[in-house]
Amino acid sequence: MSNDLEALRQETEQLKNQIREARKAAGDTTLAQACSGVEAVGRIQMRTRRTLRGHLAKIYAMHWASDSRNLVSASQDGKLIVWDGYTTNKVHAIPLRSSWVMTCAYAPSGNFVACGGLDNICSIYSLKTREGNVRVSRELPGHTGYLSCCRFIDDNSIVTSSGDMSCALWDIETGQQTTSFTGHTGDVMSLSTSPDFRTFVSGACDASAKLWDVRDGMCKQTFSGHESDINAITYFPNGHAFATGSDDATCRLFDIRADQEIGMYSHDNIICGITSVAFSKSGRLLLGRYDDFNCNVWDVLKQETHGVLAGHDNRVSCLGVTEDGSAVATGSWDSFLKIWN
């Protein structure tokens, strides 16, 4: 039995190497060569424009609304807060049944927010009730591991990723799981939906990223290259590429059409993992959130670092760029959110 397993293991390694070689052969140029004539970005200096105070404990997650004004944040204090980023006012403060929350999401319509975590449940809250109060409109149980990330497709469907090594698509109206996306061999830590919401990418503790089709539930592509857990993943604004952040202290850029990694963002001085990533609206800048409390700003084309967002007194746990590209928000264990531009 063990001999058979070893033979199969060797065979899979050989096949993986063949795929690697085939991909290499198809790569006719490198990102550095292709961008050699492009001007460098120059130093990026962002200032804190707003500080959102109201949480009483560590902030674990945040997500911008599609109006680029409101945002939602989730904290260990057991509250989900919807903020007006212009005025810094709290629009809603929603008490949660479980304070062990790891992710939150704002629906594209602005009608709903969602959250989940160690309770293994994705809870959906309606912000537009007739009575004016916010209430749980649906709880989606079904994952057998913690909920690591959730993102709305529309008002009636949401995609979740979980520590049970799967992702799922849910029908919010019925509360049923309509599709299960299986194939990762480690906890799925993060997901990102494409701009047209037809596909999503996931990053997992098996050090691979996968591209899934929302409509047929199939894994279309698998991307390897990282040497440790992938903690964060985000689509490039045009939907043809995505970036990942990993415990191997690198961010990487994968091109979907080239079917391979085309860029790596690392520095000898950076030895800690990355836990969230986000692109600027143009896609020229990549923001990475590191375990040493810092946020580095990378020039995507030149693969060089061009600035740091420093201003929190504790670990930065989450970051997000507005849809219109006008601002970046960071959330921290110091209980504050900061908005930069």
From Swiss-Prot:
Keywords linked to the UniProt accession: Repeat, Transducer, WD repeat
Family matches, as Pfam families: WD40_Gbeta
Top-level taxon: Eukaryota
SMART domains per the UniProt record, alphabetical: WD40
InterPro entries xrefs: G-protein_beta_WD-40_rep (IPR020472), Gprotein_B (IPR001632), Guanine_nucleotide-bd_bsu (IPR016346), WD40/YVTN_repeat-like_dom_sf (IPR015943), WD40_repeat_CS (IPR019775), WD40_repeat_dom_sf (IPR036322), WD40_rpt (IPR001680)
GO biological process, one term: signal transduction
Residues in WD repeats: 54-84, 96-126, 142-171, 183-213, 225-255, 269-299, 311-341
PROSITE patterns: WD_REPEATS_1, WD_REPEATS_2, WD_REPEATS_REGION
Record flagged with keyword Protease: no
Subunit structure: G proteins are composed of 3 units, alpha, beta and gamma.
Function statement: Guanine nucleotide-binding proteins (G proteins) are involved as a modulator or transducer in various transmembrane signaling systems. The beta and gamma chains are required for the GTPase activity, for replacement of GDP by GTP, and for G protein-effector interaction.
Family: Belongs to the WD repeat G protein beta family.
Protein name from the UniProt record: Guanine nucleotide-binding protein subunit beta
Species the sequence originates in: Lymnaea stagnalis
Organism lineage: Eukaryota, Metazoa, Spiralia, Lophotrochozoa, Mollusca
